[in-house]
Design a protein with these regions (language model features):
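Non-catalytic beta/alpha edge segments that cap or flank active sites
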Residues: 1-166
Length: 166
């Protein structure tokens, strides 16, 4: 089929202001290149709920992205509002996938429990919140990788390819 089209959105005041290098976004873009997927856009936004929500909405509604992966803003600091912004614009919540990300991360570190990241869909686009730490991003990619092609197929209306269970 057609390669998956992915948007990477780094949510970080520090990266947005140029004070911090975006290592986590880089891990995702490297993975996209290695996997043979298409990087549609790689952007950095500040930890501002409306800015994040508007960006997610316009990327999903453009029809240009199958998947939007965010990194950052999922923790407990007062500026961490990525899940809240995501919640504003998703149409369907996918708590099972959020659990998969968290469970996988917790095999590496108990601190994965502190990520409040959401996963959900808007139209034909899957949106997943990854943590801001490079290690957390790596763990999330490993956890979600196997599901992405099937989810994208389903979101695009290809329902006949259900993996069969005996």
């Amino acid at each position: 089929g057609v390669p998956m089209r992915i948007v990477v959105l780094t949510v970080s005041d520090g990266c947005f202001e140029g004070k911090r290098q975006d290592r986590s976004g880089q891990i995702i873009t490297d993975w996209i290149a290695t996997s043979g997927y298409i990087l549609v856009e790689n952007d950095v936004v500040p930890d501002e709920k409306d800015v994040i929500a508007d960006k997610l909405k316009s990327c999903a509604d453009s029809g240009l992205a199958d998947v939007i992966l965010t990194t950052g803003g999922t923790g407990f600091s007062l500026r961490d509002v990525t899940p809240e912004a995501t919640k504003m614009i998703i149409e369907k919540d996918a708590p099972g996938l959020a659990n998969v990300l968290q469970d996988h991360g917790m095999k590496k570190t108990p601190f994965a429990a502190l990520s409040r990241g959401l996963v959900g869909t808007r139209g034909h686009t899957l949106i997943a919140n990854f943590p801001g730490s490079p290690g957390g991003v790596q763990d999330c990619l490993e956890a979600v990788e196997m599901f992405l092609p099937h989810i994208v197929d389903l979101l695009n209306g290809h329902t006949q390819e259900h993996p069969k269970k005996d």
